[in-house]
Design a protein with these regions (language model features):
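Conserved glycine(s) in the ABC-transporter nucleotide-binding domain "signature"
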Residues: 1-119
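Anion-binding and metal-coordination hotspots
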Residues: 2-3, 17, 28-31, 101-629
Length: 629
């Protein structure tokens, strides 16, 4: 059945949560409801009435297909039960990987202080974050959907656990690092770093906290980028405090939202598996997120000599000097335009310096001196290699994007829309003089900035990378830098498949708990991908595991079924994501999902089970699911 629950937020906004629920009775014969599927909020849908109509049809179809007919050939009597519950058993494959990470041992030490099993809660939240990401409240409502799992906890206990997870974040990451090394190995000859931000479902920023400085410091105005506040109390005592900024701050959002955001930096190994992460206030500059995480990896994770690979946002003098002073290397992209690229202007357009491979690729590489600061603060001269190259495919892509914006800019001139800020307004320039007469214009007008377009065209397809590794040739530099795509994809996964944002919790320990849950979920998925040689995407892995459902029928028999009931519903509401699926495409997706499942189970010590199986045999099958070594 469909259930609509209204929720009133602190700002007075009322939203209607949409769920499909099934009724059941607990051990005390008390009526209860369990959430089968959650569909977000009604107010967020483009057409709420059409959405509800489609959902009602979907629910009728779901109930009809839950009814199980057992033929005479099965030797079991015919059975039909409208109220039978469909359970999820695909989680067992994720649990098999999770168990190899040995996090339960750490949680059990903490668990002695708690009245509830936080090890099981953490595992439950990680698995649900992969299979069915949602708010903690909605996740709790699905607590009985996993076959064979019984959780004795309240929603309040689940929220309290988040604070414990937040406090244990660093310990969890250290244990993960050790176990991943032994499970699939780590290659840290190169490590990849990037940062992104995530927005909150809240309008207000979090307040800063202040911590007293003991002993007092002199000659400093900041401690590790934290401003020192000097105070004299009523009794004349002089005190110092350092400001600890809250995490929820407005900053430069990568998704262009105005809500408070939080920064996350992520360090990843050469295999594409995360090493560690850290969160920062939302107004933290990207370039300031690298060193705290790199220092943590070097100090607590035993990270040896490595080459740090990052984009131009991390290309600062301090980051470069610190990496080299620590005995590490660096590889950053380099800006070619403007003041930051001034030193390369003469070389960029000197065709005689390039080695031409074909019409789409030419390059030049050279070693240059640069000014640096050593560990003792002395100015020194060091060397680095610079690769400048032209890529024809990139040039054509950049030209096409610019042509689209210029076309929109021209159109805006005809309908007077140029006063509104758009992505294309940078190609417009204000006219101060009448073009034909040279007289001062009596009213503001705009024209296409042809000079800017011409200047941009010069750099189409041009790219530069600087590195400390003087022995790397141009091919190895490009190949190494290309590895950054995996960390960019990881951010996409956290925002789509894992739905890390919007963030609903606001307590800072809860926020850190939320992030470590998502981090572990990402690690679990990456481990499985690594075992499968990255043959299928995370999206397809999740879809295949969500296909694995079962329901208990008469005489201790389990019906193991392929869950494809959402196919019809996806077809009806595909406009939500502006994707039009045909019946043939949906059938193809389902067929692909079955084949993906067959690929996944090859990495486990288990076999396919039949659609009708005794309960004891089914549970033996589930126990046999272990990750292959």
């Amino acid at each position: 059945m469909i259930k609509l629950d209204k929720h009133t937020y602190k700002n007075g906004v009322v939203k209607t949560q949409i769920r499909i629920v099934d009724g059941y009775r607990n051990e005390n014969d008390e009526p209860r409801q369990r959430t089968i599927e959650s569909f977000g909020y009604l107010e967020d849908k483009e057409n709420p009435d059409e959405f509800l109509a489609a959902l009602r049809e979907y629910d009728k179809k779901r109930i009809k297909e839950k009814r199980v007919n057992i033929t005479k050939a099965s030797t079991l009597p015919f059975y039909e039960d409208d109220g039978s519950t469909v359970y999820h058993f695909g989680y067992k494959y994720l649990e098999a990987i999770y168990n190899e990470l040995k996090l339960d041992e750490m949680f059990n030490k903490i668990d002695s202080k708690c009245k509830y099993n936080i090890a099981e809660i953490f595992k439950f939240l990680v698995i649900q974050r992969i299979l069915s990401p949602d708010s903690k409240r909605a996740t709790y409502q699905r607590i009985e959907n996993l076959y064979g799992k019984k959780y004795d906890l309240s929603l309040h206990q689940l929220y309290r656990s988040l604070a414990i997870f937040g406090d244990a974040s660093n310990d969890i990451q250290r244990i993960l690092n050790d176990e991943i090394k032994s499970l699939v190995g780590r290659d840290t000859s190169n490590v990849f770093f990037d940062s992104t931000n995530y927005y909150f479902q809240k309008d207000l920023e979090s307040e800063d906290q202040y911590e007293e400085v003991c002993p007092l410091v002199t000659g400093k105005t900041n401690i590790k980028n934290q401003k020192i506040i000097e105070v004299t109390d009523e009794e004349g005592n002089y005190k110092q405090f350092k400001a600890i900024p809250g995490l929820m701050k407005r900053g430069v959002s990568k998704e262009h939202v105005v809500d408070p955001i939080i920064q996350m930096g992520l360090l990843m190994d050469k295999n594409g598996i995360p090493i560690c992460m850290q969160v920062f206030p939302g107004n933290t500059s990207d370039s300031l997120t690298l060193l705290p995480i790199l220092n943590e990896a070097k100090g607590s994770f035993g990270l040896g000599r490595t080459v740090v690979v990052a984009d131009k946002g991390m290309n600062t003098t301090k980051n470069i000097d610190t990496a080299v002073n620590n005995g590490d290397g660096f590889m950053f992209s380099q800006i070619l335009k403007g003041k930051k690229g001034k030193r390369y202007q003469d070389r960029i357009f000197d065709e005689s310096l390039y080695t031409v491979v074909d019409e789409d690729y030419r390059y030049q590489e050279f070693i240059e001196d640069y000014d640096a600061t050593d560990l003792d603060g002395n100015r020194v001269v060091r060397q680095r290699k610079v690769l400048i190259y032209y890529n024809g495919a990139t040039a054509r892509r950049e030209k096409n994007k610019r042509d689209e914006k210029v076309a929109k800019a021209k159109k805006s001139l005809t309908n007077n829309a140029y006063m509104v800020s758009h992505g294309y307004d940078k190609y417009l320039i204000e006219e101060s003089y009448v073009e034909n007469t040279g007289e001062i214009a009596d009213k503001k007008s705009y024209k296409i900035n042809k000079e800017k377009i011409k200047e941009e065209e010069k750099y189409d397809g041009m790219f530069a990378i600087i590195t400390s590794e003087l022995d790397y040739d141009q091919a190895k530099i490009r190949e190494t830098y290309h590895g950054l795509w995996r960390i960019e994809e990881s951010f996409r996964v956290t925002k789509s498949e894992l739905e890390l944002r919007p963030i609903y919790v606001t307590n800072e320990k809860h926020i850190k708990g939320h992030f470590i849950i998502c981090f572990v979920a990402l690690c679990v998925l990456r481990i499985l991908q690594k075992k499968m040689n990255y043959s299928i995407s995370i999206e397809r892995i999740v879809r295949a595991l969500n296909m694995c459902k079962c329901t208990e029928i008469v005489n201790g028999v389990i019906h193991v079924l392929k869950d494809d009931t959402t196919k019809q519903f996806v077809k009806k509401i595909s406009q939500e994501k502006k994707i039009e699926y045909t019946s043939e495409e949906l059938d193809k997706i389902l067929s692909e999902t079955v084949e993906d499942y067959k690929l996944i189970i090859k990495e486990f010590n288990s076999k396919l089970c039949t659609s009708l199986i005794t309960k004891s045999d089914f549970e033996s099958f589930l126990k046999s699911i272990k990750l292959k070594k």
